[in-house]
Amino acid sequence: MPTYDNHHALKGLTLGQPTEYHDTYQPALLQAVPRRLNREPLGLYPDSLPFGGADIWTLYELSWLNSKGVPQVAVGEVVLDASSINLIESKSFKLYLNSFNQTKFANWGEVRQILERDLSACAAGKVSVALFRLHEIEGQPVGHFDGYCIDEQDIVIDSYAFDAGYLHNAVGNEIVEEQLVSHLLKSNCLITNQPDWGTVQISYRGPRIQREALLRYLVSFRQHNEFHEQCVERIFSDILRYCQPESLSVYARYTRRGGLDINPWRSNTHFTPGRSRLVRQ
């Protein structure tokens, strides 16, 4: 399992530490985690990644002051390309956003540009930001993942230790194209051990994956410690290795914490992720 959990790159994170909250703009609050920490143990390297994708963040607690001192509120969407050198640590992201609270900005466009600049610098990669006024997104329906939900199987599970071996010999001879969904994805934060709850959609074309084996595999994340983005890349890599589909997309949407939710997707084919929040978001 992860050999990087005590890596020096994680030692300075504010995550899990007593924290001072700032309400005036401080970009230095952002903290990066190198993606290579979990990619290298999986045999993933920048010049030969088997997937594209992004981490889609939703910002529910974003506020600043306009030039006249009147508070502004927005919902933000940040798309961080999976090819970036770093991922952005979520608690530092929250603290950074808090630093906007008592800071004056000329207009919404300035806020968006500053967010893009700072987040791109932290991630060392491409970041896009959209800001929405509340009336623009009020009334949007709760979405759902297309596909067959594998959660209602009548099986006994008594082991919750991560085990990619559940996917070994877990395919048949029939070639199919399908989408499978589970709401039972749960892992733990790498630093704090706090639970992370998610729904995952697996879209593939290839030998049919045994649904019992896949469910056992996903449930085995239940006591596993990794960041959201890392779990999705592990799922993608394990399915690609053991099940050898012709095409594969893995998309997870996690419940929010600290006013943020993280929704990573990875794919080796054309894939357009839905943006609607799910029922637990």
From Swiss-Prot:
Question: Kind of enzyme, top EC level?
Answer: oxidoreductase
Question: Known EC number(s)?
Answer: 1.7.1.13
Highest taxon above the source species: Bacteria
The species this protein belongs to is Erwinia tasmaniensis (strain DSM 17950 / CFBP 7177 / CIP 109463 / NCPPB 4357 / Et1/99)
Which reaction does this enzyme catalyse, per its entry? 7-aminomethyl-7-carbaguanine + 2 NADP(+) = 7-cyano-7-deazaguanine + 2 NADPH + 3 H(+)
What the entry lists under InterPro entries is as follows:
GTP-CH-I_C/QueF, NADPH_dep_7-cyano-7-deazaG_red, QueF, QueF_N, QueF_type2
Q: How does it assemble?
A: Homodimer.
Compartments, as annotated in UniProt = Cytoplasm
Pfam families the record matches = QueF, QueF_N
Q: Which GO terms describe its biological process?
A: queuosine biosynthetic process; tRNA modification
So, what pathway does this thing act in?
tRNA modification; tRNA-queuosine biosynthesis
Chief subcellular location equals cytoplasm
List the catalytic residues. Answer: 189, 196
UniProt name for this protein: NADPH-dependent 7-cyano-7-deazaguanine reductase
Keywords linked to the UniProt accession: Cytoplasm, NADP, Oxidoreductase, Queuosine biosynthesis
What family does this chain come from, according to its entry?
Answer: Belongs to the GTP cyclohydrolase I family. QueF type 2 subfamily.
Cellular component per GO, a single term: cytoplasm
- Which terms in the Gene Ontology molecular function aspect does this entry carry? preQ1 synthase activity
The gene coding this protein: queF
